[in-house]
Regions:
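Short, cationic-aromatic polyanion-contact patches
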Residues: 73-78, 164-182, 236-248
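Non-catalytic regulatory appendages
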Residues: 218, 225-278
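Phosphate-backbone binding and catalysis cores of DNA-processing enzymes
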Residues: 1-141, 275-276, 313
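Internal, well-folded beta-alpha domain core
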Residues: 113-145, 194-235
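Glycine-rich, small/acidic residue-mixed loop/short-helix segments
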Residues: 275, 281-352
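Short, amphipathic alpha-helical interaction segments positioned at domain boundaries
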Residues: 83-95, 174-195, 199, 252-257, ...
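A short, conserved structural fragment
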Residues: 56-65, 69-70, 154-163, 227-234
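Loop-centered beta-sheet repeat module
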Residues: 142-220
Length: 352
């Protein structure tokens, strides 16, 4: 598992934001700071400004393609991914609307209002989108506003675009994905299977089903379509090009963001982290993952960063005993993040 998502591949490592996102197929991205570093850690020559510039060029977009969760995905694949996997979230949306006192007619009206407000290449902040809805007489009590923003994106009308300052923005999906790919359903299932096991393998069918939210039957079909593009060894499935590949050289310590595919992409995380440490990584089981320090493929600590004007301060909480030399290696693993944000690094150890 060491360096699983960062290892060299016979086909070469992606060297662009578009390449990394296409390689994974989708990267969880509800927390933008984590999403930026998930890209940056895999693009060592990039700064945060470089990644943001690539997102402004629409090398990737954010929307809710599966599990009702925000992901970075290739723009050209957004429509078919929403049709294939987002449909399950849509199926449950009526029940959600009942709990927040929002009827279907109002939801559809909200989609129309947002579509009109964003027409002509427009881009609006979250607050401006909500103001447009309110101005059209659409109710926004409680969670209704968030649901309408989600619903419009889930239906393939809008997408999340890069922040303006600290504010989330939205635009029409067709403006940011003007040349959509249109595979048929079986082909799409095969694409999802190939991309998942290429980037996450070795993994299992259950892992793919959990990651995508697809049915077991769809996962089975996807694997059949992928055919010899994937290798199977017992319950494990992976890219056959990796089976004779030597372990990743030179990467022993890593500093990964909280919502990273290294932690999120699997049903069983036993090879990555001790069960006794999960509470520290996901406090209270609330789904909010902490950033992790990884040694030899296993999580050995968590970290939190504070961006200042003169330095980035990182507080590290070890989960196992680390010798002084190992702490130095952990600190060295944090240096790429400091370079990414363009600030000197200051490390503080819990209990020190």
């Amino acid at each position: 598992m060491a360096g699983l998502l960062l290892r060299d591949h016979p086909g070469g490592k992606p060297d662009s934001v578009a390449g990394v996102v296409e390689w994974f197929g989708a990267m969880q991205a509800q927390d933008m700071a984590s999403a930026l570093w998930s890209l940056g850690v895999r693009l060592p020559a990039f700064t945060v400004d470089d990644v943001n510039a690539a997102l402004e060029r629409a090398e990737a977009i954010r929307t809710w393609p599966m599990r009702g969760t925000v992901h970075l995905i290739p723009p050209a694949d957004a429509h078919w991914m929403l049709d294939l996997m987002g449909v399950r979230a849509l199926a449950g949306s009526a029940r959600r609307r009942e709990t927040i006192d929002l009827d279907e007619r109002t939801a559809e009206r909200g989609v129309e209002v947002l579509g009109a407000a964003l027409a002509g290449g427009g881009r609006l902040t979250r607050a401006q989108c909500l103001a447009a809805l309110a101005g059209a007489g659409v109710t926004l009590a409680g969670q209704q506003g968030y649901h309408l923003l989600w619903y419009a994106s889930q239906k393939g009308v809008t997408c999340i675009t890069p922040h303006i300052g600290k504010e989330q923005t939205f635009a029409l999906l067709d403006d940011w994905a003007p040349k959509p790919n249109r595979p048929d359903r079986e082909e799409a299932l095969g694409i999802v299977a190939r991309r998942y096991f290429r980037s996450h393998g070795p993994a299992t069918r259950a892992d793919l089903q959990r990651w995508t939210g697809l049915t077991a039957a769809d996962v089975k079909k996807g694997l059949a379509v992928a055919g010899e593009a994937l290798a199977v060894r017992g319950d494990l499935i992976f890219d056959p090009a990796l089976q004779d590949l030597a372990p990743h050289a030179g990467v022993d310590w890593l500093a990964l963001p909280g919502f990273d595919e290294y932690m999120l992409g699997y049903r069983d995380r036993a090879l990555i982290v001790d069960d006794g440490h999960l509470q520290a990584i996901i406090p209270g089981g609330n789904g909010v993952f902490q950033s992790t320090v990884v040694r030899g493929g296993r999580v050995v600590g968590t970290w939190k960063r504070t961006l200042g004007t003169k330095a980035v301060t990182v507080d590290v909480s070890p989960l196992v005993a680390l010798k002084p030399a190992e702490r130095k290696k952990a600190e060295a693993a944090l240096e790429p993040y400091a370079a990414f944000v363009g600030l000197p690094l200051r490390v503080r150890w819990a209990g020190a």
